[in-house]
């Protein structure tokens, strides 16, 4: 069982957050010795959504055996106000933060992907370096393509993990027959995990 934490979260003063695929290290900026470049997606978030991202971090910290926050986290504590300050932004864009992990009994991310794909009206764009879907996700993509949705999948053309890359290719024939467009990113290593549905 793999219980490692693969999240990439930075929260600054409880009001600015960064999350996405970027690791910390020079090779993740310029590709290092193995790749000409490293393509990734990371987001900067400002506002109330930072509280939700901070909550994910605090739960991970607690579950990993970090400082016991239970006694410090009552609503009036200074630590609570420091970790979860009120937003000062006047701009608003609806956003939902979703996390999954061994601390949750629900596969929240998998469920939201299935729902979004099922609700797609025009297009689905997915980027992933390691495309190893379960049967349900594979069928979701096939059904979307067969129903006329423009489904596009991009994976890395220059892998860092050959086994995962070979496994991904075993799904190509089935997806192509269903009408999914598949692209290989050849300009360097594609590490981005990204999905856009109907341009959103």
Predicted regions: what is each one?
Residues 1-200:
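Charged, low-complexity intrinsically disordered terminal segments
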């Amino acid at each position: 069982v793999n219980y490692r934490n693969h999240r990439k979260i930075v929260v600054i003063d409880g009001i600015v957050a960064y999350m996405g695929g970027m690791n910390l290290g020079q090779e993740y900026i310029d590709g290092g010795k193995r790749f000409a470049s490293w393509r990734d997606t990371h987001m900067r978030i400002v506002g109330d959504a930072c509280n939700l991202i901070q909550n994910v971090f605090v739960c991970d910290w607690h579950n990993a055996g970090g400082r016991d926050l239970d006694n410090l986290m009552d609503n009036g504590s200074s630590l609570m106000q420091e970790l979860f300050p009120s937003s000062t932004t006047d701009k608003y864009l609806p956003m939902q933060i979703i996390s999954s992990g061994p601390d949750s009994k629900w596969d929240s991310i998998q469920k939201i992907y299935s729902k979004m794909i099922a609700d797609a009206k025009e297009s689905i764009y997915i980027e992933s370096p390691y495309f190893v879907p379960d049967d349900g996700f594979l069928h979701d993509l096939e059904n979307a393509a067969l129903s006329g949705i423009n489904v596009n999948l991009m994976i890395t053309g220059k892998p860092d993990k050959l086994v995962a890359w070979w496994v991904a290719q075993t799904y190509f024939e089935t997806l192509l027959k269903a009408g999914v467009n598949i692209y290989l990113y050849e300009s360097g290593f594609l590490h981005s995990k990204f999905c856009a549905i109907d341009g959103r």
